[in-house]
């Protein structure tokens, strides 16, 4: 409308609504970004969040910083893994999940990053789960955990808790604790 209105009665106003936030939560500090729908520069926002998280970690003498990167394989993923020591790739057994996993492993290999894989909802498609495991074996990527679908994960989120807080003795909680211990021990 703004391009064809003969009276210039309509103007587009471009405003970047993407924001970075930092604050405390029940387990420590968190830095995160919120990208408004349709906004560009998501890689730039991820970089800003990563840099602020690094400052927070240094200021609070934290040895481990976890960056939860975006899904997919675009620029925001590259921005999220830049300067990290390790990458945990969480995938699901779907055609697109397998495709993105392969591309992400290619990227992490180019950066010479130690990578692990977690297969989320590993039981929803056993054929693709097997393809994921075979691909990881062939590329020498360790699978940290295979997490089956569990409706208790949803219930934990409804209760605003992690699954480990909600059901600490559940199979998924135990698998996640084991994965965390492997990561922090570097094995």
Region annotations inferred by a language model:
Residues 67, 89, 117-119:
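Structural beta-sheet core signal
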Residues 34-37, 41, 48-77:
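Switch II (G3) loop of P-loop NTPases
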Residues 68-74, 94-102:
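A general structural motif
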Residues 12-41, 45-48:
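FAD-binding core/adjacent interface of flavoenzyme oxidoreductases
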Residues 1-16:
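Iron-sulfur cluster-binding cysteine motifs and their immediate structural context
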Residues 74-95:
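Inter-motif core of Ras-like GTPase G domains
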Residues 107-187:
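C-terminal lobe/tail of nucleotide-utilizing enzymes
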């Amino acid at each position: 409308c703004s391009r064809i209105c003969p009276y210039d009665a309509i103007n587009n106003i471009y405003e970047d609504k993407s924001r970075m936030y930092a604050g405390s939560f029940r387990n420590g500090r968190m830095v995160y970004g919120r990208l408004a729908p349709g906004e560009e520069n998501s890689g730039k926002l991820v970089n800003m969040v990563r840099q602020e998280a690094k400052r927070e970690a240094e200021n609070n003498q934290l040895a481990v910083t976890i960056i939860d990167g975006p899904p997919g394989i675009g620029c925001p993923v590259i921005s999220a893994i830049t300067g990290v020591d390790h990458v945990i790739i969480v995938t699901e057994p779907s055609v697109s999940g397998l495709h993105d996993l392969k591309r992400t492993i290619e990227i992490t290999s180019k950066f010479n990053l130690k990578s692990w894989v977690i297969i989320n909802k590993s039981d929803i498609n056993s054929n693709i789960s097997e393809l994921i495991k075979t691909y990881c074996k062939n590329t020498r990527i360790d699978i940290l955990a295979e997490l089956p679908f569990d409706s208790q994960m949803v219930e934990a989120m409804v209760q605003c808790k992690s699954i480990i807080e909600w059901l600490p003795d559940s199979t998924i909680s135990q698998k996640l604790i084991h994965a965390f211990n492997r990561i922090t021990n570097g094995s």
